[in-house]
């Protein structure tokens, strides 16, 4: 109607304190505007002079009111002089900086992200199934910051773990710093206009008092999703709040799938109220408001390319190369938003979910930002070397402190394009960061070269030259540990979970034996991280630590 951007109107509203203006002040402003119009009128009539006199007297009377409202100035106009950022105010932005942020945001987003932006103005619930690495977390972090600055609404970021939720915070802090040189501080981040940005993991079950716009990241990888969604949606139950769910697909068996498919809406409702939602890519590629009140969209990597992410000086994706690097199954799951049928997996998602914990809450002895994150406690390293066309996987595991205790995956790494010398150098760097007492390495192929170099600085490294028997022993040990609830890793590490899910039972070429395999690619989550983890777990005997297979030596 006015031809102005929403961000400009929000800036006027905030600068002139429209929400703080009382009815009597609005009357004074209207009278002033009418008085100005009459004064500048060239040919005045008698009634114009009468109205000028009346308006002048009325404005004088309003000025004589008790000075309990400082919004009207001596001239009768509303206070609203342009405010500048106060140097002593934490996390403060001037109006000019907010406008610059808005411009930087709109100039940086792609067409498919612009679709999310438009949907955010009119849809209460956005539900997006997406390809990996298309900038969803990056986009929603920026969107939320601007919404908080423009409207004063709280923003709640919920992820499988607090570490994952803090990825939002990193994007927000970086955006403010790069665009307008404002350094945001605090956790949560509190803005001068009262808006608060919360970053939560699964401990949000105890945070029901929070309220604001909800952003739920990678919800298809969160354990006990239905339980958590009830709490999370309650934070945004007021009509002014919006809810945004976005994730890469996991398993058809995950309890978030009915929420995506619309089957959850039908539960407990009479049959005549049931809805049938078309969740095919053809139906949802452009975004669609569905019968259950959700706005859904599927964005594949090919949609992202069509949406402009390859239009810059540095294209994000080379689809031809990706089709070579990934198997058809991997390409469909990672990039075309197709769900995994893990019914044939040795490690289905339902078995892995109890292992996924919010490490920032439950591990108080691990400090990932320290030079020595685990102090002088011992760790084991498992390594799956890079073969032609795939990535190298490495995990650092804290072994149990007592027999039958829990293994904790402290860190996991993915290294691309490194030769065997560079891979060995990465392992050596870890031995300086941790007190390493065991290293297990696959010595098949290039792994032999890595192993030879590792033994120069860690002579006790254990080799695994793959055979049917060795693979079977590794998988059996991992199954035993996982099914007994003895493995923990960060709930935000869906790449590690997917890596285990990719391992399946198969038949050897001779048809005489059963073995295990996982597709290999440059994506760490498909096989290599799981095998690396199993190399470390194998340091404990299959039957566990017992009196007959453990001992100690005391030196006098």
Locations of regions flagged by a protein language model:
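Inter-Walker segment of RecA-like/P-loop motor cores
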Residues: 166-212
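Pre-P-loop entry segment of helicase/translocase ATPase cores
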Residues: 11-14, 19-125, 196
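C-terminal nuclease/phosphodiesterase catalytic domains that cleave nucleic-acid phosphodiester bonds
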Residues: 64-80, 226, 346, 395, ...
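Conserved Walker A/P-loop ATP-binding site and its immediately adjacent core
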Residues: 152-172
